[in-house]
Amino acid sequence: MLVSDYHFDLPDSLIANYPMPDRTASRLLHLDGHSGEVVHRQFPDVLDLVQPGDLMVFNNTRVIPARVFGQKESGGKVEILVERVINVNEALAHVRASKSPKESSKLILGQDKGEHIEATMIGRSGALFHLVFDEPVLDVLMRAGHMPLPPYIERPDEDSDQERYQTVYNQKPGAVAAPTAGLHFDEALLEKLKAKGVETAFVTLHVGAGTFQPMKVENVKDHIMHAEYVEVEPSVVEQVKAAKARGGRVIAVGTTSVRSLESASQSGEIAPMQGDTSIFIYPGYEFKTVDALVTNFHLPESTLIMLISAFAGYDHVMAAYKKAVEQKYRFFSYGDAMFVTRNPQAKGPQGEE
């Protein structure tokens, strides 16, 4: 199974640089995983695709303004992207500069926002730099940080992104990328789901910048996933078990919710979980908990389109993406969405199992 099997041609004009004026105004491509049938809908139609007794599981992570600009003591420009807050004053970060900062060197950050914040580079962890700040990291980011828009959105962040690159139900700060399927839900739609008898549950997965990193292998099975923090509380486990017992479906909102639930189900049955996951889901994976999912359209040759292919089958997914391009759906973080049901006989490229 090759990474190149997951390539598709996407015109730049279909990459959404801004969200729709209203959260629910996006289009929704409904893919029946079993048959491969595609129906073109509007996002509020998700109400017609769920049933009383279903459980929708959302990721309640909050995107932190993790991108900070500044300079080295030498005066050279520097840009940091905090990947993970380790403790109050320390973080692991990607650092972009003409020359990488040396150990013990200082960075002066936040001048573009009228701040003067110092951080010291005390070591490295792989590609990440270990930084110690002179004040709490989250305080620094709230004052001096910019929303970390994905690299394919080719514009500076704007004030509106502070709201629109967050879900309305975010609770726990820690992500450096939004769980984008959730961006389509507003309070009114959540209330309508509740009124229909659909239960909701919340997991936490702090999305890392690694989600945008291109795969650097040719063979899919050689790829090693980056680790991300996940939390599935005992109450969520009970909700999942109750939904299954009453014949309801577990519907994951976003690939991060899928990865959270499946990470907590590796023993064969879902159990509480708190810690890192590096689960990599691609065709051949046997889903243990998730029955349907809501997701945006993903990058060619990405781990996320592989996850969707594992869920609904490679041929069905690639055919659906082809139709989405033909119908000019909007792609990626601020784009349109899919509602996908699971195909128990899903296969990979060339019928691989």
Curated annotation (Swiss-Prot):
GO-annotated biological processes: queuosine biosynthetic process; tRNA wobble guanine modification
HAMAP family according to UniProt: QueA (MF_00113)
SUPFAM superfamilies in the record: QueA-like
Cellular compartment(s): Cytoplasm
EC number: 2.4.99.17
Protein name: S-adenosylmethionine:tRNA ribosyltransferase-isomerase
Alphabetized UniProt keyword annotations: Cytoplasm, Queuosine biosynthesis, S-adenosyl-L-methionine, Transferase
Functional note: Transfers and isomerizes the ribose moiety from AdoMet to the 7-aminomethyl group of 7-deazaguanine (preQ1-tRNA) to give epoxyqueuosine (oQ-tRNA).
Lineage top rank: taxon: Bacteria
Pfam families linked: Queuosine_synth (PF02547)
Organism: Marinomonas sp. (strain MWYL1)
MF GO annotations: S-adenosylmethionine:tRNA ribosyltransferase-isomerase activity
